Amino acid sequence: LSGKTITQVFNATKPHKFTFYNGEPSEYGKLLVGKTILSSEGYGMFVNFNLSDNVIMNIGDGVSVRYYNAGDKIPANYQLLLTFNDDSFLVFTVVMYGFINVYPDSYIDNKYYKLSRESISPLSDKYTEAEFEKLVAEAKKTLSAKALLATNQRIPGVGNGVTQDILFNARINPKQKVLFLSDNQKEVLFNALKETLVDMTFEGGRDTQRDLYGNAGGYKTILSAKTWKNPC
C-alpha cells in the first residue's frame, strides 16, 4: 500500500452500531483524500496507516481490511472504503466490533492504544515470566483465567479468540479464578501463552482470520467457530 494516494472515501453501506469512529465518519473524506500512505505499523490490537501531512488512520480490534485490484467487484457491505490513484481500493468491515479512526495531527487519543504502545509485546523476548507474574499479582483475585488474558488489553493484542487456544494448551479451565492458580499452573500458562502466539504468528495467523488479500491464516484453531461442533 505504500506510495498509494487516496482519491475517494466512501462511508458505510451498512451502518454497524459497534463500529466506533472518532468524530464524524462523514468528515473522513476531508481528512484523507489526497493523502499518500507512507507506512504501516502494529501495536497490540491496533494498526496504524501513516499518511502524508502527519495524518494517521488507526484501526483496532475486530476490523477486517481487504485490498482489491482495479476492476475487482466492490463488496455490497462495508464500514469504510478508500480508493487509490491506481483505481485499486481498500475495504474495511466489522463483524463484532472495532475502531476506525482518523487523526489529523498524529495524536491518538485512545487509552487502549496508549497501553499497547507502552506495554511489552508477548512475542518479545523481553516479555518474561517475571512480567507475567507481575500481571497475575496485580490482578483482582476474583478474576477468571480467561478474563486475565482477554480483557482490558492487559497483554497487548491478546483477546478472546487467541485466549481459547492458549487456555486449552495450558489445560486450564477458563472460569478458574486467578486466586487458585498454583505456581505450576502459572508457569504452564505463561509457556502456553508464548508458544501459542508464536505458532499463530509463524503460520500467518489463525484460520478464522484473513489477510489483506483474503487468504486465511495457516494456524488451525483448536477452539473456534470452525471447530465447536467437532468432538474433543
Please tell me what each predicted stretch does.
Residues 72-76, 126, 139, 156:
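Short, amphipathic alpha-helical segments
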Residues 98-140:
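A short, charged helix-loop
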Residues 1-114:
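Acidic, proline/glycine-enriched N-terminal capping motif
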Residues 61, 65, 113, 118-121, ...:
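Flexible, active-site-adjacent loop/turn segments at secondary-structure boundaries
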